[in-house]
Amino acid sequence: MPAKRITDIDPLDRPREKIEKKGASALKDSELIAAILGKGTKNNDILTISSQVADLLKKDNLPSYDTLLRINGIGPTKAAVLMACFELANRYGTPAEKERIRITEPDHILKISEVTDLSGKSQEHFLVTTLNGASEVICTRTITMGLLNHSLVHPREVFADAITDRAAAIICIHNHPSGNPEPSSEDITVTRQLSEAGKILGISLLDHLIYTKGKVTSLRSLGYL
């Protein structure tokens, strides 16, 4: 069977296009690697190659140049590109020992740059923050953009990364460009739908926050969770 090409993937699901639309934080590890490498080989598609590299990162933290070369589809050029990325991350990345952000109150979400970056956005953005068992932030990702409704915000999309992160809980955040902090009927419907899905999956929806004018409104505090 011929290798699957990036052009065979739905444009909305292509890694580089997803970065343009949603930002790099919305991508899984394998998708980020695919965006870096660009394309696969005749015998091994880029998604397979990037998944194998992502698996190595989980097992070996930072694989060596020689280890990368053992992956079918990675030659000296791709290995060098990845090693350069690893080194940049090592030089400029957040120190591993830095304390993670812990969310125990709604306002604590304002410590996350992806949330405060919602200021001035003309469209609604729906974000999900995954948390470990100690309520520490694992990752914050943009799930969708546009008018919030239950058809756009599907539990499958919301919880997919939480499952990958092995998260214990999530917090959903979306902005109201109008500046009105009050939840709409659609906000409440989406919140309850996601809460029920979380109960089935064993991943709690701790809160759904509305971001406006540098502040957040908690749907849990309002009694909708």
Curated annotation (Swiss-Prot):
Q: Which residues form the MPN domain?
A: 102-225
**Per the record's keyword annotation, is Protease included, yes or no?**
yes
Motif JAMM motif positions after renumbering to this chain: 174-187
Among the record's GO biological process terms, what is one? proteolysis
Binding sites annotated in the UniProt record for Zn(2+): H174, H176, D187
Regarding protein family, the annotation reads: Belongs to the UPF0758 family.
This protein's name: UPF0758 protein Mhun_2739
Species assigned in the record: Methanospirillum hungatei JF-1 (strain ATCC 27890 / DSM 864 / NBRC 100397 / JF-1)
Give the organism's phylogenetic lineage.
Answer: Archaea, Methanobacteriati, Methanobacteriota, Stenosarchaea group, Methanomicrobia
